[in-house]
Amino acid sequence: MQILVYDNLDEKQKEEALKRPAISAKDEISKIVSSIIKEVQEKGDKALIEQALKFDKAEISKIKITQEEITQASNRLDKDLQEAILVAYENIKKFHEAQIPHEIALETTKGVKCEVLTRPIEKVGLYIPGGLAPLFSTVLMLAIPAKIAGCEKIVLASPAKINDAVLFCAKLCGVDEIYQMGGAGAIAALTYGTQSVLKVDKIFGPGNAFVTEAKRQVSSDINGAAIDMQAGPSEVLVIADDLANEKFVASDLLSQAEHGADSQVILVCLSQDFAKKASDEVQSQLELLPRKELASKSIANSRIIIAKDLNQALEISNLYAPEHLIIQTQNPRELLKGVKHAGSVFLGAYSPESMGDYASGTNHVLPTYGLTKTHSSLGLADFSKRMTVQELSKEGFLALGKSVEILAQNEHLDAHKNAVTFRLESLK
């Protein structure tokens, strides 16, 4: 890993040190995705079946998974894995139930009652990628809050053949329908509906460049679907002092690096000595990983930054605004006060990112690419929307009437003014 001393860098070099890999969609990907979306709109299920063979090398005759198939998958699943999933399920459920909003009702002026009500999004679609490492944990992260929020219909899509653990988690969380379809075609089907697939209002879940581009395209279509967030490559920034355990730090860096070659890991520490120890430990652990080749590409593009003190380390972290922030210092909670931007924060030696990824209870769907400056981690609020209510008595109307007439008149909105004036005259 490249080691940089922050105070030795000029402003341009500092900016370069915290630069992320480019994620702009290539024109070729955009065109392919547009073509796939159009194909699904025109041919429905037939297009999805053809795409399963073309892209996933899967021969299927139907899109919707039956209850019998779900039961069989659950029966095949290793019992230890089932129990581990149940532990995660309970913690995620507890944490998201605590986010249930309270209704707000108050009088702003005597006789003027204002309220905030929360209502669930009716139909949501959850996308779970396939591949060698099926993200069944993401089913929990998406379906549990959807269920707690009260969404009327929760459907899930994943490429054929769907992993048994994905089906087990979907059943556990009360997902209504499961579709074996993947990629941009799945996003199109969830957006516009097909003979078998329910058209949804909002789509959640990660994916490759084609899925990400498909989500971008459908979310910009007035007849399309809303999406959770635009996803970039996964990332972690670790702040460590000289007393941190370099073995723990290295394992945290590598647990992020193994996600993919474009994942970014940054260590901010306080000395050359610790930087060297951590870098050596990363190389030692890397050699033993099954996904060594993938992780090594990420590590090659990652860096260690030496800060003069913890205040500067925080400054660097806030400039970067990481998806995951791990603080391995003697008093991590003290540093938390200065954290301005992060998707999820992990405090102390025994809070590895893996805990949040799976079972602590927090959600692992997080904004990336610096979006933590303006966006939040996924939560219950993402599966619902708020509406305001106002109710004025005659007394309340009279109390505000004259002021609203003046405000409307000065904005030259005569009909607005008349709506008040006519009522005031009727009360004389």
UniProtKB/Swiss-Prot annotation:
Binds 1 zinc ion per subunit. GO terms for biological process: L-histidine biosynthetic process. Pathway: Amino-acid biosynthesis; L-histidine biosynthesis; L-histidine from 5-phospho-alpha-D-ribose 1-diphosphate: step 9/9. Zn(2+) binds at Q256, H259, D357, H416. Keywords: Amino-acid biosynthesis, Histidine biosynthesis, Metal-binding, NAD, Oxidoreductase, Zinc. It catalyses: L-histidinol + 2 NAD(+) + H2O = L-histidine + 2 NADH + 3 H(+). Pfam families: Histidinol_dh. It is an enzyme of class 1 (oxidoreductase). Disulfide bonds: none annotated. The keyword Membrane does not apply. The active site is at E323, H324. SUPFAM superfamilies: ALDH-like (SSF53720). One of its GO terms (cellular component) is cytosol. Its EC number is 1.1.1.23. It comes from the Bacteria. Substrate binds at S234, Q256, H259, H324, D357, E411, H416. CDD domains: Histidinol_dh. PROSITE patterns: HISOL_DEHYDROGENASE. Catalyzes the sequential NAD-dependent oxidations of L-histidinol to L-histidinaldehyde and then to L-histidine. Belongs to the histidinol dehydrogenase family. PANTHER family: HISTIDINE BIOSYNTHESIS TRIFUNCTIONAL PROTEIN (PTHR21256:SF2), HISTIDINOL DEHYDROGENASE HDH (PTHR21256). This is Histidinol dehydrogenase. It comes from Campylobacter jejuni subsp. jejuni serotype O:2 (strain ATCC 700819 / NCTC 11168). The lineage of its organism: Bacteria, Pseudomonadati, Campylobacterota, Epsilonproteobacteria, Campylobacterales.
